[in-house]
UniProtKB/Swiss-Prot annotation:
Residues 108-122 have a biased composition (Basic and acidic residues). One of its GO terms (molecular function) is DNA binding. GO terms for biological process: DNA-templated transcription initiation. Belongs to the TBP family. Transcription factor required in complex with TAF3 for the differentiation of myoblasts into myocytes. The complex replaces TFIID at specific promoters at an early stage in the differentiation process. This is TATA box-binding protein-like 2. Residues 175-184 have a biased composition (Polar residues). It is found in: Cytoplasm; Nucleus. It comes from the Eukaryota. The keyword Nucleus applies. GO terms for cellular component: cytoplasm; nucleus.
Length: 376
């Protein structure tokens, strides 16, 4: 279709392919300003008409979008999580994956793993909501001790939609937790029955008591039997009795220390006997605040011990100076007991307030001593 002639001052590039309109009346010479304005208004009206008639999908007015780009639809949760149907179909098939860069052992393990079928994957995706597609706790708790075969077996036993199968049953122990427990370093422990045959024996008990009166030590030393007093050497009277076989230190302030008893009852009985001796000498002695301050026990583990290896392994608890003292000094934190360990297997425990602390300390140290037993 032939287009009408254009005015000379209207550029031809501004209106390509415009529809035809009636030609202007012929003029002689240059057009006037009114004619130019009329032509301009007519041109703008034609452009506005074309803008209103342009289709919304026109390639001229719509942004260019590549054909291979897939836009997610937020209103559809299925497309938001499973956007590409082709990917969902091939998600369970790994036969086409190139595994040549992996070692032969890993490749063989991958071949042995059971693969979930496409039908089970589709049913699982349809039955579960997008929020329930998050990884289960069993998938998150994968540790060091789990190999690929155990993971594949546990995954193949899960059925789609069965939420009870995810949690382990309490009747069957979890083999994965056992493998993790075997990796964790632990202090060597032995059953209590192994060390039940060895019971520490109490060798000495130190107790204190308050007689609650001032004492004349010279008078006590002169009139009492089996008593000695040397103020230049020690500022207390040293008194002994035969039953129980103990020794007492009596101070002028009225405080007394009783040592040498083999049990708590013997220590109390001996302290009361010393208080009775002081009363018979004319002092108003009482028996107040009796308390056991220290208990000493000893035992024999019946095997030699490598003290050099023990002090290297337990440096923060032990000290060993064979030039100064032949025994290893082990300071236990709980219970707060000090142990003297000798290479022959003899053990001395001291620092306890009650008998149970002696037994507990020996039960704790016996597995450690057994780990450093001399073989030759």
């Amino acid at each position: 279709m032939a287009s009408a002639p254009w005015p000379e001052r209207v550029p031809r590039l501004l209106a390509p392919r415009l529809p035809s309109y009636p030609p202007p009346p012929p003029t002689v010479g240059l057009p006037s300003m009114e004619q130019e304005e009329a032509y301009l208004e007519l041109y703008l009206d034609q452009c506005a008409a074309q803008d209103g008639l342009a289709p919304p999908r026109s390639p001229l007015f719509s942004p260019v979008v590549p054909y291979d780009m897939y836009i997610l639809n937020a209103s559809n949760p299925d497309t938001a999580f499973n956007s590409n149907p082709e990917v969902k179909e091939t998600s369970g098939d790994f036969s086409s994956v190139d595994l040549s860069f992996l070692p032969d052992e890993v490749t063989q393990e991958n071949k042995d793993q059971p693969v979930i079928s496409k039908h089970e994957t589709e049913e699982n995706s349809e039955s579960q909501s997008p929020q329930s597609r998050l990884p289960s706790p069993s998938e998150q708790d994968v540790g060091l001790g789990l190999n690929s075969s155990s993971l594949s077996n546990s995954h193949s036993q899960l059925h789609p939609g069965d939420t009870d199968s995810v949690q382990p049953s309490p009747e069957k122990p979890n083999s994965d937790s056992l493998s993790l427990a075997s990796i964790t370093p632990m202090t060597p422990m032995t059953p209590i029955s192994e060390c039940c045959g060895i019971v520490p024996q109490l060798q000495n008990i130190v107790s204190t008591v308050n007689l609650a009166c001032k004492l004349d030590l010279k008078k006590i030393a002169l009139h009492a039997k089996n008593a000695e007093y040397n103020p230049k050497r020690f500022a207390a009277v040293i008194m002994r009795i035969r039953e129980p076989r103990t020794t007492a230190l009596i101070f002028s302030s009225g405080k007394m220390v009783c040592t040498g008893a083999k049990s708590e009852e013997q220590s109390r009985l001996a302290a009361r006997k010393y208080a009775r001796v002081v009363q018979k000498l004319g002092f108003p002695a009482k028996f107040l605040d009796f308390k056991i301050q220290n208990m000493v026990g000893s035992c024999d583990v019946k095997f030699p011990i490598r003290l050099e290896g023990l002090v290297l392994t337990h440096q923060q608890f032990s000290s060993y100076e064979p030039e100064l003292f032949p025994g290893l000094i082990y300071r236990m934190i709980k219970p707060r007991i000090v142990l003297l360990i000798f290479v022959s297997g003899k053990v001395v425990l001291t620092g306890a307030k009650v008998r149970a602390e002696i037994y507990e300390a020996f039960e704790n140290i016996y597995p450690i001593l057994k780990g450093f037993r001399k073989t030759t």
